[in-house]
Each structure stands twice: as structure tokens, then as C-alpha cells.
């Protein structure tokens, strides 16, 4: 039993932040505050479904966050490591003894002329909602271009095509670069069945985006009423702005215990941190493991013990290709893909099970945290009446 109460602030309420907060809140003597710019939890692995209306991709924090976790709806603007204080956009500050840096990731500026001005993103709630509105204002027969053939691009292209849209997928090189060559085949067959035009090859690169089209590296110009950019992610620049060391993608640099190389009181969880010698793929699968691991690092330090290196286990990647079919790409525990897969309707079922399992894991964590203490005031929200809060944490 700890003699003094320890204050832990979790910055970011995604998969990593929520799992870390719930784990910490189970421990007596630890008070947890979660700072997040939105009053709801965003189920990011369902954002492509929000675009077509098959899911709203949002859960109330009351469902996934322990009742003894204090929720502050605001945007963190700076971390003062020396004073152990987080400044908020609403004008206040939150002090901490330990901090979990879990700001997640979002779309990056690809540096392609016109992309920022005219393309849409599916990497956050606001972007997905804007895309949905743009599609609603566009005739169903109008051409739609999806740029990037990673998981987000594949799922978005298939979802739109199944909804009756005329979709072109510009791969940037190869279809499904994170997939095994054998697993790309059922993906290609499914996209062809849905009527998606797939452009592959070294010159299948978008070099310019306009209001009504895209230009490729080989000179081709494609009409596009709605262009969706899914290639590349970057984390918010909060760590860099706070004077903490980051990598080229803006991720907080940590050691093998997820601890910032600049301050042992700051621990990263999810997409926002990186161990340079052991980088993990930015993913929900990684985040739900890194959140509890970050919490354990802090709890061990509080108890006067040495923090242990993080251990990860990966099972594969689940992709939905519309509502009726999908592909599950299996991997070795180190996240290296192999040739094993499940496709078709069974693949779609596995994806749906994975999504529900992830949500159930968060709900279970919230219940365990809530069982430790009585419920108090949960929500402090200078922006709680405004759903469209600033992007990024």
C-alpha cells in the first residue's frame, strides 16, 4: 500500500491511452486524469465504416473508461517536464507525478501539391465526418480516388465500392505492401469483383491533386470528384513542441520500457512513441498492448522496482473488404507476415470479431478500474458542448 497519492496524467484517449488509464486506475493510491480533445472515444478501426454509414465509430467514455478516471475534455498544448505540468488549450493546467504520452497518430502532409487543400482523410473522426458529408453531396456515379493501398486505403476503397461508388485505387507501387504476396491475391480478386480500378507500379504515384482530379507520375490525369488520401501517418507535434526528443515522424523516443529518453516520469503508449531499435507498426493491435505496458512501467517505478522491457506479441492483420468479405493476414509473433490467411466471408467474420473483442477489452478494463473505487465527478469539459473539438492532443 502506498502512503501518498500519486497523480498520473494520460494525454490522449485512444486505444493506448484508455488501456493505460484503466490499468493505472485499478491500483490503490493512484489518481488518474485523462486529457482528450473529444468527449467520446473514437473506434478508429471502424472509421471507414462511418464514411458509408454502417457504423458511427464512436463510444461514450462512460463505457470504456473507468468511473474513477477523471476525464478532462481539452487539448494539451505543452508538457512542462521540469514542472510536471500539462498546459491546456482552454487555459488551465494539469499537474502530474507521471505522464502517459498517448496522443496517437493522424494524417501527415504528403508534400504533394493540392493534397492538403483538396484531399480528404479517414485518419480521425472529424476527417471521416467531412468525407462522409462530401460524398453525400456528390452524385453516386462521380469518380472517387483513394490514394494509398495500405490497410486504410484497402478498407476504404472496398467499403465505397460496395456502396456503389466508382472507385480508383492508386497504390503508389504495390497493392497491400504490408501483406504477403500470396495474401494480396484474394484482396485483388475482391477489389476486382467490387469494380475497383487498381493502379499499381512505380509510376502509380500521385504528383498533384486538384479540385476535380489527380495527376500521376506517368503523366496521366484522372478525374476525381472526391479524393481520399490514406498514405502515411504522423503523430501530433506535442512532444517536439515541449522540448522532448522525437524521431522523423514526430514520435517520442523511448527506451525498451517505453520511457522517454529525456525524462523517466514520461512514458509513451501507442503510435506516439518509438523505440528506435525496436519500432512497432502503428496499429490498434500494438496500442492495446503498449497501453497496459506503459502503465506497468509507471506502477513498478511507484513501487520502487525496476521497470521491465516491453514484450509484444502480434497475430496478424484483419481487413474488411466491404461488409461481406475480408482478409485476415496471419503473422509471426514479431509481426513478420507469413503466407497463411483467411479470406471471403470468414475473413469478414474474423475482422468483425476482432473489432468487437477490442471494444469488449476496453469495457472490461473500465469495469475492473471502476470496481476499485466509488464513482465521483468524471467530466471536466470546457468544450463539452462542442462535438467538433480541435484535432490532435
Placement of each model-derived feature along the sequence:
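FAD-binding core/adjacent interface of flavoenzyme oxidoreductases
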Residues: 2-6, 69-143, 228
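A Rossmann-like FAD-binding core segment of flavoenzymes
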Residues: 70-79, 86, 94, 163-256
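FAD-site-proximal beta/loop scaffold in flavoenzymes
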Residues: 117-140, 214, 221-226, 230-289
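Rossmann-like dinucleotide-binding core of oxidoreductases
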Residues: 143-189, 193, 197-199, 282-296, ...
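A conserved FAD-binding loop/helix module that cradles the flavin
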Residues: 240, 248, 272-322
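C-terminal auxiliary extensions adjacent to catalytic cores
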Residues: 323-393
Amino acid at each position: 500500500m502506498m502512503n501518498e497519492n500519486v497523480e498520473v496524467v494520460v494525454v490522449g484517449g485512444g486505444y493506448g491511452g484508455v488501456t493505460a488509464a484503466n490499468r493505472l486506475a485499478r491500483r490503490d493510491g493512484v489518481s488518474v486524469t485523462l486529457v482528450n480533445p473529444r468527449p467520446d472515444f473514437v473506434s478508429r478501426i471502424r472509421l471507414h465504416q462511418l464514411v458509408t454509414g454502417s457504423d458511427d465509430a464512436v463510444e461514450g467514455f462512460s463505457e470504456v473508461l473507468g468511473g474513477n478516471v477523471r476525464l478532462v475534455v481539452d487539448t494539451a498544448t505543452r508538457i512542462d517536464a521540469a514542472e510536471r505540468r500539462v498546459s491546456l488549450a482552454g487555459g488551465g493546467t494539469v499537474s502530474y507525478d507521471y505522464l502517459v504520452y498517448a496522443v496517437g497518430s493522424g494524417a501527415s502532409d504528403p508534400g504533394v501539391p493540392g493534397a492538403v487543400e483538396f484531399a480528404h482523410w479517414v485518419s480521425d473522426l472529424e476527417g471521416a465526418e467531412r468525407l462522409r458529408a462530401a460524398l453525400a453531396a456528390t452524385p453516386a456515379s462521380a469518380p472517387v480516388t483513394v490514394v494509398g493501398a495500405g490497410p486504410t486505403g484497402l478498407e476504404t476503397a472496398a467499403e465505397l465500392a460496395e456502396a456503389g461508388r466508382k472507385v480508383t485505387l492508386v497504390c503508389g507501387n504495390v497493392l497491400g505492401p504490408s501483406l504477403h504476396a500470396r495474401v494480396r491475391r484474394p484482396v485483388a480478386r475482391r477489389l476486382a469483383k467490387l469494380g475497383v480500378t487498381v493502379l499499381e507500379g512505380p509510376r502509380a504515384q500521385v504528383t498533384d491533386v486538384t479540385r476535380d482530379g489527380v495527376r500521376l507520375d506517368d503523366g496521366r490525369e484522372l478525374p476525381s470528384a472526391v479524393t481520399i488520401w490514406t498514405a502515411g501517418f504522423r503523430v501530433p507535434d506535442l512532444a517536439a513542441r515541449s522540448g522532448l526528443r522525437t524521431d522523423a515522424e514526430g514520435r517520442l523516443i523511448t527506451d525498451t520500457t517505453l520511457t522517454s529518453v529525456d525524462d523517466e516520469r514520461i512514458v509513451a503508449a501507442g503510435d506516439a512513441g518509438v523505440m528506435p531499435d525496436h519500432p512497432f507498426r502503428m496499429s490498434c493491435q500494438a496500442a492495446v498492448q503498449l497501453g497496459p505496458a506503459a502503465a506497468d512501467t509507471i506502477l513498478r517505478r511507484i513501487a520502487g522496482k525496476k521497470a521491465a522491457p516491453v514484450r509484444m506479441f502480434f497475430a496478424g492483420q484483419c481487413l474488411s473488404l466491404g461488409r461481406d468479405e475480408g482478409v485476415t493476414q496471419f503473422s509471426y509473433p514479431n509481426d513478420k507476415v507469413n503466407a497463411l490467411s483467411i479470406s471471403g466471408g470468414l475473413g469478414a467474420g474474423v475482422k468483425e470479431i476482432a473489432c468487437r473483442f477490442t471494444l469488449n477489452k476496453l469495457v472490461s478494463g473500465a469495469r475492473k478500474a471502476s470496481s476499485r473505487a466509488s464513482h465521483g465527478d468524471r467530466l471536466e469539459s470546457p468544450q463539452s458542448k462542442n462535438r467538433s473539438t480541435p484535432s490532435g492532443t
